[in-house]
């Protein structure tokens, strides 16, 4: 939950917590553990600013500046103090700011050193009031090793428990390329830093507000993407938590038209935010797992439900040796153990508990809405199974499956879809 400073303090010294009280009470009623981001400037103390780029200024409008001067810092720490004192009996996990490396959410050109200073004095205040608190910092838009290095150089890493990131895009696997440098930076400050992926999702339709990918949207695409994201985060990115954004949205299906007048290529393609990704500030965020307005579950909702039913934190990341062979590529033309194929073969994420193993595999193509001709692959893996089952996490269907055990601790599965 993002607790925005300027939403709770609209008059100096006067706080309205009612919406957050309602949300937190509902979460706790269902034994859901919340983590809260204290975030956003407040124009009464900090002033406001916007992008230099007129297109982005038209999309985002003005945002409060970050609380970096004496006046802003004093107001911010009063807000932090009030929030922590109010909720410390209900909240243990506190995150410092939402996406400080994003111009709109930071409120000014991103500055890792400035964010690090804000983390330093915010964390000191939280721990003074709530010594048992768990501190989350980073909350970056994307995975930025450089930004991480800058902010950790200005605060005390020993007082931070978790570093978090948010990573969108039409292929969850793309985030893997940034993780190695990111982890090296973390280890240089504190080996063993816990990593969370705190926010990310994909729209079930090409019409959405908020960030959108450049790929097509669809209900099945969303479900497949959600599952792939979960395994990419917890296996390839070493995250101990992978969060999906979001459950529901209360935006308007037919928002008012903006006053923007596109020019140049934008006349044909719309107004791109960046990299061809269009942005509308109002409407429905179609990344939600419940349809708008009736809130019926989408396929991704059930996929997430199936995943959470199938595994939990008893399973730990494992690294068994394995090899896929493509027997029939189906509609996925060109896959196989070829040097010039990308992606070539499925990926594997492996987890083990005290008495079981969980293997997830998928082909890292851009997700397809419809698959009419599945590929067939074989898997050799250094994990032993007594009674293996094959589960389709999209549908929840479970199937018996044959396994060959050529030797102790090894399994071979043939003709997997």
Regions found by a protein language model. Give the residues of each.
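Aromatic/acidic polysaccharide-binding cleft in carbohydrate-active enzymes
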Residues: 208-214, 219-333
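Hydrophobic faces of well-ordered beta-strands that scaffold small-molecule active sites
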Residues: 1, 34-38, 92-96, 135-138, ...
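Solvent-exposed beta-hairpin/edge-strand motifs
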Residues: 378-399
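Solvent-exposed loop/turn segments at secondary-structure junctions
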Residues: 3-7, 40-44, 98-103, 140-144, ...
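N-terminal substrate-binding region of glycoside hydrolase catalytic domains
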Residues: 1-82, 95, 101, 412
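Carbohydrate-binding surface patches
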Residues: 324-384
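Active-site cleft segment of glycoside hydrolase catalytic domains centered on the general acid/base Glu
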Residues: 49-185, 206-228, 257-263, 374
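C-terminal beta-strand-rich structural cap/linker in extracellular carbohydrate-active enzymes
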Residues: 402-417
């Amino acid at each position: 939950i993002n607790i925005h400073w300027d939403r709770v303090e609209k008059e100096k010294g006067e706080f309205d917590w009612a919406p957050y009280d309602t949300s937190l009470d509902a979460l706790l009623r269902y034994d859901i553990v919340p983590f809260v981001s204290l975030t956003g400037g407040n124009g009464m103390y900090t002033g406001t600013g916007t992008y230099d780029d007129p297109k982005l200024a038209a999309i985002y409008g003005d945002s409060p500046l970050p609380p970096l001067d004496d006046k802003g810092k004093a107001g911010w720490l009063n807000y932090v103090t009030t929030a922590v004192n109010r909720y410390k009996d209900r909240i243990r996990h506190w995150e410092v700011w939402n996406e400080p490396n994003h111009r709109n959410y930071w409120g000014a050109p991103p500055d890792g050193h400035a964010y690090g200073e804000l983390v330093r004095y915010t964390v000191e205040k939280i721990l003074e009031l709530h010594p048992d608190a768990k501190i989350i910092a980073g909350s970056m838009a994307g995975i930025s090793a450089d930004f991480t290095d800058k902010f950790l150089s200005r605060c005390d890493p020993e007082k931070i428990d978790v570093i978090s990131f948010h990573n969108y895009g039409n292929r969850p696997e793309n985030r893997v390329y940034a993780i190695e440098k990111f982890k090296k930076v973390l280890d240089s400050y504190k080996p063993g830093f816990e990593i969370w992926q705190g926010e990310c999702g994909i729209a079930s339709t090409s019409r959405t507000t908020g960030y959108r990918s450049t790929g097509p949207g669809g209900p099945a695409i969303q479900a497949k993407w959600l599952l792939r994201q979960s395994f990419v985060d917890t296996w390839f990115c070493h995250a101990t938590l992978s969060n999906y954004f979001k459950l529901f949205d209360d935006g308007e299906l037919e928002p008012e038209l903006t006053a923007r007048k596109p020019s140049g290529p934008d006349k044909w393609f719309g107004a791109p935010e960046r990299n061809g990704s269009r942005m509308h500030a109002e409407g429905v965020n179609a990344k939600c797992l419940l349809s708008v307005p009736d809130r019926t579950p989408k396929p991704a909702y059930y996929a997430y439900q199936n995943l959470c039913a199938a595994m939990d934190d008893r399973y730990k990341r494992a690294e068994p040796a394995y090899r896929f062979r493509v027997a029939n590529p189906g509609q996925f033309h060109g896959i196989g153990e070829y040097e010039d194929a990308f992606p070539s073969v499925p990926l594997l994420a492996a987890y083990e508990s005290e008495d079981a193993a969980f293997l997830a595999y998928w082909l890292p193509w851009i997700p397809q809405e419809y698959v009419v001709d599945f590929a067939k692959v074989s898997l050799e893996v250094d994990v032993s199974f007594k009674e293996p089952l094959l589960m389709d996490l999209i549908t929840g269907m479970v199937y018996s499956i044959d396994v060959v055990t050529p030797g102790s601790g090894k399994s071979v599965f043939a003709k997997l879809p």
